[in-house]
């Protein structure tokens, strides 16, 4: 990515900005440099991006020393996952981000190898309840997110489902993901109606989505 284009992506708030923030810290930009270019993004967020870029460099360095997914130690896997890296990103970084692309990673070095190692180490995400009232008062909702956590002591509440509470059949609805500005919400609308139809039939509906700002992920859906 040319430097001038990176600067443009930092200055203009579009869907490219998050990738641009990460790339800027990869290239050694300081917190203040990035803050000035973005017009004042809160330092708290910038520090998180800077940290992720530093950890990515650590993963890549480990790969340069010959580490393969099968050699990842438990504390390393927990830390990398807790910092927000996907299994695919870890595999790609260990391989040095080859120009051929992550799809061409060889067996034993690909995403599946990292996932297999993570399962072997019994490292899985936790389910945490979303505080829909921002700590203003206690709230219990059937609204959860997954996390591996890292760095700071958790104040979240783990969700441990009691599958014996209900004998109803459970059906999972896969959400449509992020919705861009200008795009219709018909896919999300369809998910909500699918949930309603499942409930009308007497079953339990579980929706899995990765868009916290849309109707299908509202706590009362």
What are these regions (language model features)?
Residues 1-221:
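ATP-dependent carboxylate/acyl-activation modules
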